[in-house]
Amino acid sequence: MEKVSLYACLILNLSLLVIFPYSKASQADKLNEFILSRKSQNPPKTLSWEEGDALKTLFSSAAYVAPPQEELRLADKIVTLPGQPYGVNFDQYSGYVTVDPETGRELFYYFVESPCNSSTKPLVLWLNGGPGCSSLGYGAFQELGPFRVNSDGKTLYRNPYAWNEVANVLFLESPAGIGFSYSNTTSDYDKSGDKSTAKDSYVFLINWLERFPQYKTRDFYISGESYAGHYVPQLASTILHNNKLYKNTIINLKGISLGNAWIDDATSLKGLYDNLWTHALNSDQTHELIEKYCDFTKQNYSAICTNAMNMSMIEKGKIDSFNIYAPLCHDSTLKNGSTGYVSNDLDPCSDYYGTAYLNRPEVQKALHAKPTNWSHCSDSINLNWKDSPITILPTIKYLIDNGIKLWIYSGDTDAVGVTISRYPINTLKLPIDSTWRPWYSGKEIGGYVVGYKGLTFVTVRGAGHLVPSWQPERALTLISSFLYGILPASVSPSN
């Protein structure tokens, strides 16, 4: 039977997706693009993050640490953001941290402290995925940050379900070339990959903690979504290794959480197509062909498998694959005099409002950012990605074995949804500590939860790829439970 290489097959799928273009490339699109276009290693390397020879340099020398940075911290404090609402009762900071002084590589951050008891609450680092997408544009201004952008592209409104209600939250644009992060050596943009991103993010953290020394001993958590299913575990692993090597730069890592995360190619690809079928986006006939002829653990697919996967994309049609029940953006023009509010019906044109806001000169000045043609995602970073393990499961196992709390959550209306998390988790064969049950947020079932030894899996009802955008209250309930170390409530508070 004729065989088609994995790479050729994925390119064919990618060309089919162009038939149904999105109005604007988003984080979810970038993940899809990356999955369909990347070259897996041949033979695929399944070594854990800790075992690869190429990673020796990651742990072989102390990180670059700048001198004391109190003056920089004071300079990074934001006086006010243009268009922000009245009554802001928390401190916010933003600016650059140098991660490589020789090449002039600097990463941009935005930090919001909690409005109450910030001196005792934990520190949470948020990372968006892609690869190549901004944690400022998505995480901070569209998902879990304290503000969202009105449809006028000029003003902000408060998010009552912001995660800084329960933690001090740090948003990082990484790697260089994304958002406001940059390098004076442009060839750096062609070298981005999992290894360099983990290393730069670690160096960023060490230096950021020098700038904010009051957080050095604070409980520290990392959370992220999408391709951050790679970033977050890899950064956590890097921290653990360096904590053992260098006692003067200890980071008090307690746990990680992964949302709608891509962590294992073979099981996640199967989960993707199963999810499309169970949500009635694919026909029985196409799904049966994929089930029979597609072995996602192999490098080469048969022509029948390739054609079936292509047909799956055609059958799905022009919908938002990452919230399959949501409308598309049909009018991206800015609206004057609009005032938004946070609900479970996210405006599908929100990307455009954020882009307009973050490109305003007065906004970039207030954020202490260099003048930049800012965008949510970088095409060059995504398409030039240098290294990406086909599985992160060994790294996840390493973190569990080292006592790091680990939650994985999935919105159930995302095509990259529940099955792409369940299938990889099942391969770990962890004992169940707490059986599958519903959990509540307010008076409604927020989703379902199952507890394993060392890992908790949570679904979020009615949420797409960006869980805090589509179900902000449920996302806050979830992250609060994660930080407090308890499972979400099993009964409604009204009962």
UniProtKB/Swiss-Prot annotation:
Q: Where is the signal peptide?
A: 1-25
**Protein EC:** 3.4.16.-
* Effect of disrupting the coding gene: Aberrant mycorrhizal development with an increased number of septated hyphae and degenerate arbuscules during root colonization by arbuscular mycorrhizal (AM) fungi (e.g. Rhizophagus irregularis).
The source's domain of life comes to: Eukaryota
What switches on expression, per the entry, is described as: Accumulates in roots, in a RAM1-dependent manner, during colonization by arbuscular mycorrhizal (AM) fungi (e.g. Glomus versiforme).
Q: Which cysteines are joined by disulfide bonds?
A: C133-C377, C294-C305, C329-C349
Main subcellular location of this protein, as a coarse class:
secreted
Q: Which residues form a coiled coil?
A: none
Which keywords does this Swiss-Prot/TrEMBL entry list? Answer: Apoplast, Carboxypeptidase, Disulfide bond, Glycoprotein, Hydrolase, Protease, Secreted, Signal
Gene Ontology cellular component terms for the protein in this record: apoplast; extracellular space
Q: Which GO terms describe its molecular function?
A: serine-type carboxypeptidase activity
Q: Which residues does the record list as glycosylated?
A: N117, N184, N300, N310, N336, N373
What are the catalytic residues? Answer: S226, D414, H465
Compartment(s): Secreted; Secreted, Extracellular space, Apoplast
Q: What class of enzyme is it?
A: hydrolase
A biological process from GO? proteolysis
Complexes and interactors = Interacts with KPI106 and KPI111.
Give a short account of what the protein does: Carboxypeptidase that, together with KPI106, controls mycorrhiza establishment and arbuscule development during root colonization by arbuscular mycorrhizal (AM) fungi (e.g. Rhizophagus irregularis).
Which family does the entry's similarity section mention? Belongs to the peptidase S10 family.
Q: Which PANTHER family match?
A: SERINE CARBOXYPEPTIDASE 1, SERINE PROTEASE FAMILY S10 SERINE CARBOXYPEPTIDASE
Q: Report the protein name in the record.
A: Serine carboxypeptidase 1
User: What is the native source organism of this protein?
Assistant: Medicago truncatula (Barrel medic)
Gene expressing this chain: SCP1
